[in-house]
Amino acid sequence: MEEMQNMSKKYPFQRIFLIVADSAGVGEEPDAAEFGDCGSNTWKHAAESVGQIRVPYMESMGLGDLDDIPGVSKVDHPKAYCLTCRETSRGKDTMTGHWEMMGVNTVKPFQTFTETGFPKELMDELSRQTGHKLIGNYSASGTEILRVLGEEQMKENSLIVYTSADSVLQIAAHEEVTGLQELYRCCEIARRLCMKPEWKVGRVIARPYVGTNKNDFHRVGGDRHDYALSPEEDTDMNILEQNGFTVSCVGKICDIFNGKGVTETQHTVSNEDGMDKTIDQLKNKDFTGICFVNLVEFDSEFGHRRNPVGYARALEAFDKRVGEFISHMRDDDLLMITADHGNDPTFHGTDHTREKVPLLIYSPSFKKGRQLEEAPTFGVMGATILENFGLKRNDDLIGEPLKEIFE
């Protein structure tokens, strides 16, 4: 009933699409030195790797006004409101970034086991409860660890356990040897064990793979499953849901929030699939609320794998889809394009980088856009969404609405 009432009301924007180009940061944060990330700049360095990047739609929205990106010009009259956002929370991971967009300030970083691997007590208990031998237990690239341990995992029907610079426990197993449901069962056990304070991680991730040997193993992204912690407090998504608004999620958003505040979700297998599903909602679904989208391949396929040319080409491909998206927008639609952290594909190591993120905000109803002052938190995104729908935020959520877009 509430949802029907909301659809009959008129808001500045009936449908808001928040698209996260996962890891596409625009330069080091002021505190980047504390994270070992001085000099990181995902957009700029990806663009440099191909000489000049061609992203005409995002260029017209003011992307080039935010940073010096080879091939992306500054524009005198951007079509969108454009700004950079700093991260208040103490982290540079997926959960921390997305949670902050929806108002959550993560004061204490999630626990990581990058240098040490997981404690023997945890590994022993996980092996006992799952009934599988565990191999690995170190920080690694997901593709590299399959080359090293994938054949052994198949022979023994063991489980490959590994981590990264993020607060994650990842379990890889062959889909045809271990089976998908068995992998999920083992990950559910790991999630329960990793609720203990001394072992608590932000996410447990099921990483199924296929192939016959180390030269052709590859992960099955569509069958990946994240077992995340739930935010301790209600987020902006909960407030929307509780007031009868649609919170439609595309990609891994539902997993990141552990389903909290989500009214419907669609998993994706690629950036293209994510944009296909998002544009389908734009063209064919009438709703009042938000469509929250994560496009993970920038991060998983090109950032972590330190493939700057691939990253640049993926950004160019995304820009074409942005153009397609814009062509189908209604005057009462709003598009927000952003990122959740950096992952400079030219940087040392294989992990995320502490960077500011771009925020491009566009509607066909805008008479003109302009560059806004840098925001001190990603929380301006959720705050602006609630402002649009006339909803009050909880006092413990961070971020102020960007009221300029309603002028």
Placement of each model-derived feature along the sequence:
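Feature captures the catalytic ectodomains and active-site-proximal regions of enzymes
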Residues: 1-407
